[in-house]
Amino acid sequence: MTNKPSRYTITSALPYANGPVHIGHLAGVYVPADIYARFLRSKGENVLFIGGSDEHGVPITIRAKKEGVTPQQVVDKYHVQIKQSFEELGISFDIYSRTSSKIHAETSSEYFKKLYEDGKFIEQTSEQYYDPKAEQFLADRYIIGTCPKCGNENAYGDQCEKCGSTLSPSELINPRSTLSGEKPVMKSTKHWFLPLDQYEPWLKQWILEDHKNWKTNVYGQCKSWLDQGLQPRAVTRDLDWGVPVPVAGAEGKVLYVWFDAPIGYISAAKDYFKNSEIKAVHKNNTWEDFWKKDDTKLVHFIGKDNIVFHCIIFPAMLKAEGSYILPDNVPANEFMNLEGDKISTSRNWAVWLHEYLEEFKGKQDVLRYALCANAPETKDNDFTWRDFQARNNNELVAIYGNFVNRALVLTHKYYDSVIPALGKLEASDEGVIMMLKEFPAKIAASIEQYRFREALGFMMDLARLGNKYLADTEPWKIYKENPERVKTILHIGLQIAANLAIVSEPFIPFTSAKLFTMLNLKANTWNNAGTIDLLKAGDQLGTAELLFDKIEDATIEAQVKKLEDTKQANLLANAEVKPLKENVSFDDFAKMDIRVATIIAAEKVAKTKKLLKLTLKTGIDERTVVSGIAEHFEPEAIIGQQVSLLANLAPREIKGIVSQGMILMAEDADGSLKFVQPAAVVNAGSMIG
């Protein structure tokens, strides 16, 4: 868009309402989208910021089956949780809607019928797996079988979660239905397709020629798809959960979720403008103005897994309908990893937003700051709890918070919290004021180009400027001999803080609001920033408070331990179980004398790493056993433990020590050893069998 927009429509990818939101969602989509929306509002722009829950599709039905409830109960539960979590983090949607609403069903049905009646679809019949017992066609995730790549017997019809291979249902060996356990059959089914190949020439021109300014990761992925050639894509599927296909002969079919979900942006706008008072907030515009007028700028915020849908498929849908505007930009981010590993909801490898908000009360801005500072803007990035702690302690506390606290505390100490007058300026003052003037424009330029990490860095540089100014001028040292000079220093320091309150609002809005209150700063917008006229000499400041506090090591260690426990649980859940050995006769088994013994002494065997010399009380004697467990247990820690002893194993000499038996151990998935022992203390010598 070359001309200045009259309004902005900002959408953020609709999260699936089959589970809570995690930091990957936030870093990739919602924090940058909120920064952009808040920035534009601060500039006085007419903004519609749309969010909502994606409540249709197979992931919802799978979750419902897992929890033993209906799909509607699943989406009702998670929609509320997701919406509340976003509100608590300060994601400032104008509306957070949902695709199970009546208005969405009506909107997406009307959209489908318009394209259907205009002849934009093609009909195709294909063979698909069908479960005769359940009387249902099977989506990819409703089929499991043996992976042809690694032999995993529980691979899904679209992916093997063990080896990560992408699959199709027809590739599975011995496929079976997850609904009934029966072997599915192939059955013909008719569906409607959007012929993307017909839009390929237009898409190549629109994306590759007209939008070369898109982010390199977005442009590159689009080019790859277009170079491979586009194929017709089904807009309907056989499923009992979703928006019913609104044409005759389509019983048992619903709109494919990729088709109905982006229409959710449009239905959300319709829903929002049902309230007649809303129009006044948006300069008497209507929902159509935000979706159909050429002077509207449409921006989609998404993660990289949604690039094809928002850059190729949804634009083709909009083009086919004919009356809607097309996106001006789609600044998709890459993925945020967690402690060096890919975030995975199925493995519970995530930092969940609702848990963070509970465990780090009042620290919404710390998370927002850390995620923006490390945002995966053009490549995957990694969230670590140590980096989170460092961002808080070394930047928010030591720079931003320290500067603001110094300026306000010194003003309170010397002038009873009354803003002192600006006196004669020295060269250093004029230099600082000149630098101050540049910051709003620098930050704005970065935000407008979707470089949010860079913009955040400039915002923090303004705090650094204030910190350095106070450190260089040292007003606490010269107050007695030159109080007039201190008035000027603190006046400028407070003006920098006021500017900081304005330009930090898109990034850390809770902190900005506190700073506005502490400075008694009246409603000021972005356009006022860059001056030293925001505060008036003689005005009273509010009460100073610490904006940030240090996060201690123990707090971080608890979070790291939580993740380590999750990793161990995953190892156990996915451990390979060794196959059974050959059968033995009962008579052979009966020959083994296995009994409970108690360890009464333990010591390391000299010149070895793995061996412990154990003295055992067996109930019939005390004996020595040499065991290879030294790397797993400290000798003094196991004295008094009861163990299982194979007591009639023939003695043998190990490192000069005669070992009379063998301790039975279990090896865990992570290679650690555990004693096989009774659940409660029993008499030494008690038989096992």
UniProtKB/Swiss-Prot annotation:
Class of the enzyme per the UniProt entry, highest EC level: ligase
Reactions performed catalytically: tRNA(Met) + L-methionine + ATP = L-methionyl-tRNA(Met) + AMP + diphosphate
Keyword presence, rRNA-binding: no
Main location: cytoplasm
PROSITE patterns for this protein: AA_TRNA_LIGASE_I, TRBD
Organism superkingdom: Bacteria
Cofactor field: Zn(2+)
Family to which the UniProt record says this protein belongs: Belongs to the class-I aminoacyl-tRNA synthetase family. MetG type 1 subfamily.
Protein name: Methionine--tRNA ligase
Source organism: Cytophaga hutchinsonii (strain ATCC 33406 / DSM 1761 / CIP 103989 / NBRC 15051 / NCIMB 9469 / D465)
